[in-house]
């Protein structure tokens, strides 16, 4: 029998309360929480809302776990009380079909409203639903529940999506030569770096050391200068400085990692060419600020691509000059680089000149 709405509300209210040191970890308080079913992995369950999403916190999930992922984990563990609780709080019971492993648990999920089975389209939608939740716990649990799961491994549309994502940054392995399981693992690893989640980054780094240079590659491509600095100084890499710069120029606005590579000695003129080839005007202006001057070669590329915007920018070459404030810093300290070139702070001197012309 499902609990009443009042019971559900009472449990939810209790789970949102701050636990005072006066009562925690008292036996009485623990007893109340256990009686209410607000207990998981030998610790209390608390909830909080982040951007309209309910996140579950326990001692094991200190960074917060999305309610739907928490349901999937509870189903995997055959924890009937929590399956019911998370469903009452709004989790989609259909996601439980991903991790169900006994007939009794499947029966419970279906009694709570789950379908008989999920279509390939619904499997893909589940992936989309959980992939953008930015916490270390979410990234790690998503990887553990999905990366080796047949429902996801056999989804052709998901494979196309992941191949597209990895193709954008893969340079030291051929996608056709690795399994889809490894592709998914590399994908979740890259998301940890993109979202700048130290705990998740360390989890993947320790678990998948044989992914040679992957952490460095993702740090460059996703503009995570702090992680780039850490891994570059921690391990020897087979990737040369100019190749690192090419990766940093992969996406527009990667100002901190471009600058970091420049400080290591990468060719800023080649970076300017790469930026034009990728059609990134933001990176182009940074390269000009850092002294790049291969305007004629870049103009040829812009003309061949019929890119009027870049042609216009490059045509004002006689008005541009290096930005002394950027060149005088001369540091690989990620904190200082970030303060100088954070995307929300940095305003290109030469872009301002271009706009005034």
Swiss-Prot record:
UniProt cross-references to Pfam families, sorted A to Z: ASFV_360
Superkingdom, natural source: Viruses
Entry keyword Magnesium: no
Ranges for the ANK repeats: 66-98
Listed GO biological process terms: taxis
Signal peptide: none
Keywords, comma-separated and alphabetical: ANK repeat
Family from the record: Belongs to the asfivirus MGF 360 family.
Function: Plays a role in virus cell tropism, and may be required for efficient virus replication in macrophages.
Name assigned to this protein: Protein MGF 360-22R
